[in-house]
Amino acid sequence: MHRCHPVRLARPVRPIRALMATLALSGALAGALCGAPPAAAQTLEKSTVRHGNVEVPVEIARPVGRGPWPAVLYIHAKRGYEDVDREHVRALARDGFLVMAPDWLAANMIERWPDRHVPESEGDVEAALVALRAHADACRQPVGVVAKSRGPYFAVRLAAKRPQDIGPIVSYYGHFQNPNAPEPQQLFSVAPEVSQIRSPVLMLIGDADFELRRMVNGRAFYLLWERGVPVELQMYPMARRAFDFRADQSPEEKMAARHATERERAWLRRWMALDAQGHCTGAAPR
């Protein structure tokens, strides 16, 4: 990393005015040589939304500047809502999205890594969707969804139930079957909602992920494609489950994570019909 040195003028100049000129020139040149200071970290606002008698914890990240902004619902995996999720939420906000992330485990005091699906948690995520749609700084259009592992199951359930509210879905190694379904259904079919939704779906998964998860992604991909729903499946070579944040990331997984971030941004912008600056236009997606 290069060091920045003070800039000296070639010859002395008159006091006061000269000093001001020197400071201005030095500041300009130092900025050019060193680059602008890094932007402050995106802050997260903690809040709650109500689902029946339950207060659902949510975190909200906003882009810099004034809204309205395109809105994204972030749905975490069954491992829980953690710092890696917070960084993903901040990154989405830096890309220009107003993001709300409900903690669907905490709302019902569910332990991390639950061995079954708790249907009540779907209402918690839906309550966050309703709050996000009504947010004063959200564009008045369907929201995008970024979801991980168990999260895409929530997403397709919501997209089938509230098609007017759900726009494009970005799925990271997603589960496209009811986790409580019998084993034969886990192996040979997908959730019935996959046959109903119209939301464009981008699937991001590694080719070294678990075989069952790769199979259910493949089945969901073919079913959506056959129905004419916009869908793409990005399979990353040599990438394992949680390739985008795992502590022992290989060089290939680090590149896959960067590529996935670019694909995520492009998918959301395309199917939310945003302009080149990432602003809402009100146009129909193409």
Regions found by a protein language model. Name each.
Residues 17-35:
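Bacterial N-terminal signal peptides
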Residues 208-212:
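Acidic catalytic loop of the alpha/beta-hydrolase fold
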Residues 44-62, 68-135, 242-248:
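Serine-hydrolase catalytic machinery in alpha/beta-hydrolase-like enzymes
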Residues 197, 203-205:
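Short beta-strand/loop motif that positions the catalytic acidic residue
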Residues 127-196:
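Primarily recognizes the serine-hydrolase "nucleophile elbow" in alpha/beta-hydrolase
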Residues 230-286:
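C-terminal catalytic histidine-bearing segment of alpha/beta-hydrolase fold enzymes
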Residues 213-223:
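Short alpha-helix in the alpha/beta-hydrolase fold that links the catalytic acid
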